[in-house]
Amino acid sequence: TDAGGMTCHASIVSRELGIPCIVGTKSRSHEATTSIKEGQMITVDATNGIVYDGVLEDVVKPAAPQEQAVVASEYIPVTGTKIYMNLGDPDLAEKYGVLPCDGIGLMREEFIWTTFIHEHPLHLIETGRSDVAVNTLAEGMRKVCQALAPRQVVVRLSDFKSSEYRDLKGGDKYEPHESSALLGWRGASRYYDPKYTPAFKLELEAIKKVRNEF
């Protein structure tokens, strides 16, 4: 991506999935997404922020194998400060649920929307498929809660920007074009807006379903 850093969504999701990701590539008004052509061979030093033209064989080394998360065999002391993890992908809950943490401090809902649902919530309502959102959200939360039980899981309800909601199927019809989407119609200001409240209720129904049925 041209913008972003170690804590942006692209970085977080890529780390969870174990895939390479280069963010924040804009330099001196040049953007990598436009400067680097399709099929062009380059070497990227992501640690130092350097891009070399062509393949530099002397600096290209095979990546070390990634080790899976395991439970430490030694005694884990109880700390005065609770240790929580962030998790976006429900399919990774079992893998990381075995770690000696106190629970999930932040489970982002957005990953479920973009990876499993793909459609704007208001579009689902208009087409009579509200249950798709409710059931898919609930199933994602169930996986995480089940893997971490009886530890606490904190779910953050959707916090997409209008530009991100617009990328979902049907989103063009419902989303405004804002000069600064980062500071625009998102979060709580969206939840209680009459134009979006029906969609917000789908998220609440999913939470209710998890608590009552699972």
For every predicted segment, state its role.
Residues P65-F214:
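Conserved alpha/beta-domain cores
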